[in-house]
Regions:
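Divalent metal-dependent phosphoesterase catalytic cores across multiple superfamilies
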Residues: 1-145, 149-169
């Protein structure tokens, strides 16, 4: 599966974790890619994950996305995001489509308010990334900045989004 490698950058975040950034270029549309994150000379490495690139827009091929909003933790129902991811999305794909998350979903769009307080490191880790890891390791995430993210460094560090939009609206 893994015949090529690339490298990127990494830095320590909040003293207790590392953020790794890699830009993948020249990917072929509608193709499954496998990846793992390797630190150093295989000092540590992740499980093997996969994702599928979207089809060419000119093909007009159908694809599925999930759109959700306001996924920040609610004290009256603190596990709702985890339930949506695991009991909703992942269980449904597993039952209906042989657990092929990458094959069934082209992307997940979260239209803001990923956490309650964007300046809180533990909320990003414990309330957003940890519950969603099983989904986002196979399906690309496209987050949209909400008022709860509060224009924080964490959002900017975690998400490197394309800036090639319509001129004047990048």
């Amino acid at each position: 599966f893994l015949t090529e490698s690339t490298s990127g950058t990494s830095f320590t975040n909040n003293g207790s974790s590392k953020i790794h950034t890699v830009e993948l270029t020249t990917l072929t549309p509608n193709t499954r890619y496998y990846y793992r994150v390797v630190v150093g000379n295989y000092e540590s490495y992740s499980e093997l994950y996969d994702f599928i690139t979207p089809p060419e827009s000119s093909s007009e091929a159908d694809f599925k996305i999930i759109a959700m909003s306001d996924m920040q933790r609610d004290n009256s129902n603190p596990n709702k995001f985890n339930e949506i991811i695991h009991d909703g999305v992942i269980d449904y794909i597993s039952e209906e489509h042989s657990n092929d998350l990458a094959g069934e979903l082209a992307m997940v769009l979260v239209t803001g308010d990923l956490v309650v307080t964007g300046t809180s490191y533990y909320q990003w880790q414990d309330h957003f990334f940890e519950p969603s890891e099983d989904l986002f390791s196979h399906v690309p995430l496209y987050p949209v900045f909400g008022n709860h993210e509060q224009n924080t460094d964490y959002y900017i560090k975690y998400f490197h989004l394309p800036d090639n939009g319509t001129p004047g609206y990048e």
